[in-house]
């Protein structure tokens, strides 16, 4: 199995292809990407027969920006007979996966696939039973075994394969299913909520998103991101010349500072989180974020980088490299992750966590 399917946001196939080609090449896993515009997925075909498995084992999924999910697959199954689609799929997976922990029957996230998605949900139950009978799936779901993927690209046409549960997205189609809170000031609140799900392990939420923490929201108006911090019982400095939603001010947890987010400088040293969703050139935002991290003004940050029309992967890579270089220059060890989230549009979301600093300054987490 030498092909890897990568699910992505429709319209960003070229960026996804450029990224996987670059990062696979860095690990000497060479191949080429098959791209169809607005398809919502990319296929990276490796030159060596076992390199698909090697790629999804060795390249950290968390290092990918534009992929929502990935899995290794074999050849395309076509013209599945409507009276028995199950037998050919089981046949393709026997000998490839043994005692898998979960089945996901998926499609790309496109308007054209919505009808197909309804079929996939109905088809999952009988297919799961057949795969269990054949030993492809274990008799119970477990996160400790590979995930079996059946990916339909059209009626009667699918790829079959697997991913490793320790190196994939835990979400169906790579999309966290979040509900918009009725009392949130704007839909942008879902970006930050999704970022928490993607970047912070669930078993660390109580420690890293704790009650009573202090946070700063730069460019906060009307308060979509502040809402997520308030919901977690944090105290928030919301920085923006524009007004905040009265519902947030009424909580007593928000201090509204009428300032430019690029000029604001914190006066206290107990800030755990800084979040930022300002519409500005990505290089300018990256420079501001690096300044906050280098000066130890916050412990963790989540921010958005708005993407240009062209060379998006190159632009994001350049901005992340700049932040990394600034941290290295000042002896700061940090963890950097970036992802184009489901709720992002022409942007990517970045998470940086300071681990420790080799020079004097604020007390870091470890």
UniProtKB/Swiss-Prot annotation:
**Predominant location:** cytoplasm
Residues of the active site: 306 (proton acceptor)
Transmembrane stretches in the record are none
GO terms for MF? S-adenosylmethionine-dependent methyltransferase activity
Q: Where in the cell is it found?
A: Cytoplasm
Q: Which Pfam families match?
A: FtsJ, RlmM_FDX, RLMM_N
Coiled-coil regions, chain positions: none
Q: Which reaction does it catalyse?
A: cytidine(2498) in 23S rRNA + S-adenosyl-L-methionine = 2'-O-methylcytidine(2498) in 23S rRNA + S-adenosyl-L-homocysteine + H(+)
Q: Which GO terms describe its cellular component?
A: cytoplasm
Question: Among its keywords, does the record have RNA-binding?
Answer: no
Tell me the Gene Ontology biological-process terms attached to this UniProt entry: methylation; rRNA processing
Under which EC number(s) is this enzyme classified? 2.1.1.186
Q: Where does S-adenosyl-L-methionine bind?
A: 188, 221-224, 240, 260, 277
Family membership, please give it: Belongs to the class I-like SAM-binding methyltransferase superfamily. RNA methyltransferase RlmE family. RlmM subfamily.
Q: What does this protein do?
A: Catalyzes the 2'-O-methylation at nucleotide C2498 in 23S rRNA.
Assembly, in brief, is: Monomer.
Q: Which PANTHER family match?
A: RIBOSOMAL RNA LARGE SUBUNIT METHYLTRANSFERASE M, RIBOSOMAL RNA METHYLTRANSFERASE FTSJ DOMAIN-CONTAINING PROTEIN
Query: What is the protein name for this chain?
Result: Ribosomal RNA large subunit methyltransferase M
**Could you tell me which species this protein originates from?**
Escherichia coli O1:K1 / APEC
- Give the lineage: Bacteria, Pseudomonadati, Pseudomonadota, Gammaproteobacteria, Enterobacterales
């Amino acid at each position: 199995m030498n092909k890897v399917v990568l699910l992505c946001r429709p319209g960003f196939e070229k960026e996804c292809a450029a990224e996987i080609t670059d990062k696979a090449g860095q690990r000497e896993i060479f191949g080429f990407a098959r791209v169809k515009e607005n398809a919502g997925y990319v296929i990276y075909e490796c030159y060596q027969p076992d390199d698909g498995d090697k790629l999804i084992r060795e390249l950290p999924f968390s290092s990918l920006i534009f992929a929502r999910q990935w899995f290794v697959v074999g050849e395309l199954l076509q013209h599945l007979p409507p009276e028995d689609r199950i037998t050919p799929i089981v046949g393709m997976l026997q000998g490839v996966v043994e005692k898998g922990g979960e089945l996901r029957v998926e499609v790309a996230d496109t308007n054209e696939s919505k009808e197909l998605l309804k079929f996939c949900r109905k088809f999952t139950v009988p297919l799961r039973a057949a795969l269990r009978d054949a030993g492809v799936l274990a008799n119970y779901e477990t996160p400790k075994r590979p995930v079996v993927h059946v990916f339909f690209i059209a009626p009667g046409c699918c790829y079959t394969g697997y991913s490793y549960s320790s190196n994939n997205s835990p979400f169906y189609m790579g999309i966290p299913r979040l509900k918009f809170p009725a009392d949130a000031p704007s839909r942008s609140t879902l970006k930050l909520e999704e970022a928490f799900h993607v970047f912070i392990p669930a078993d660390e939420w109580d420690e890293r998103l704790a009650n009573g923490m202090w946070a700063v929201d730069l460019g906060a108006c009307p308060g979509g991101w502040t809402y997520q911090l308030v919901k977690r019982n944090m105290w928030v400095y919301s920085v923006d010349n524009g007004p905040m939603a009265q519902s947030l001010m009424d909580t007593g947890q928000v201090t509204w500072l009428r300032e430019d987010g690029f000029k604001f400088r914190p006066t206290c040293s107990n800030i755990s989180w800084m979040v930022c969703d300002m519409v500005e050139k990505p290089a300018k935002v990256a420079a501001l974020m690096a300044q906050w991290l280098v000066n130890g003004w916050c412990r963790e940050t989540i921010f958005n980088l708005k993407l240009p029309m062209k060379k998006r992967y190159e632009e994001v890579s350049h901005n992340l490299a700049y932040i990394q270089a600034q941290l290295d220059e000042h002896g700061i060890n940090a963890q950097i992750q970036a992802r184009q989230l489901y709720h992002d549009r022409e942007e990517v979301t970045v998470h940086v966590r300071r681990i420790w600093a080799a020079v004097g300054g604020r007390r870091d987490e470890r």
